[in-house]
Amino acid sequence: MSEMNVDALFGDLDELGQITAKNTPMPFLFCVVSWGAAATHWLANTLNAHPDIFCAHCANLFWARLGGARYVDGWQYLRILGRESPASRACGDVHGVSRESIPDLRAKLGERFNCAILVREPLPRLQSQLALFQNWPVKSTWNVDYVQKFIDQDVRLPQDNVINRLFLHGVNMLNSIIHEEPLAPVWRSEDLTTNPVMLARFVEELTRSRVEIEPEWAERATRRPATNPHRRQPALQPPFEDWQIEAISKIVEPQAWQIYDRLGYKTPDFIR
């Protein structure tokens, strides 16, 4: 990396930080954007298992929660990972880089960076996210004040409590695809976890061919078991109560269902 780039990209650091940046090689950087419940932990572990890739899973969150560090995102986050893995051909993160930071990363890094979006079938994904909400002891982790706007728009709750507001929040997260699709190629987690050809193509496209995938590696990777499942038991049928179906119908935008349909996910019958 040239001196000019060091000045532009690391000028906010002190002298020791700039010297460290200048004298440590920076690998190709990537991120996979996802709001979760889409095999993000599995994908990060799988990428990190490749000898040419260093991949974290929202390490910035754990630095803040467990180490008391300042929360960092985007370039400030990826440059730490990159300096941690100078021998890797590609380095990045799954689930820890916000979609809002992508334009800045592209502007700063150009062809030395790439991004992908990871999704999953909407309703099973929602069920997994709801299981996380239910099982997590600190409900205030998520800000649900904003869902009042849905209540004001006649989305009915059987009881106005944090669990039901978290449901509305989870439903609204399905609208994220509207903002994600224009940012980067969208990949289905169902394909990456089961199809070796798709996984190999994903890795090579994500790393702009810095990493070439052997078929045997992809075959082994897709045999890796699921990790960090939020929903331990199969969902009972029907999966949603009437008020929840009504909320899904009112909150998820038609544009979101259209995008999911293009991705090959069937729109729920109750939407039509």
Positions of predicted regions on the chain:
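PAPS-dependent sulfotransferases, especially Golgi type II membrane carbohydrate sulfotransferases
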Residues: 1-25, 162-163, 171, 175-179, ...
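Glycine-rich phosphate-binding loop used to anchor ATP phosphates in small-molecule kinases
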Residues: 85-104
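Short aromatic-enriched loop/helix-cap "lid" or pocket-rim segments at secondary-structure transitions
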Residues: 66-70, 105, 127-131, 137-138, ...
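PAPS-dependent sulfotransferase catalytic core
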Residues: 1-89
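A short acidic, amphipathic alpha-helical/loop segment
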Residues: 101-108, 176
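Short catalytic/ligand-binding loop motif for oxyanion handling, primarily in non-cytosolic enzymes
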Residues: 38-44, 62-65, 99-101, 123-128, ...
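PAPS-dependent sulfotransferase catalytic domain
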Residues: 76-79, 136-201, 205, 250
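Conserved phosphate-donor/acceptor-positioning beta-strand/loop module used by diverse small-molecule
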Residues: 109-132
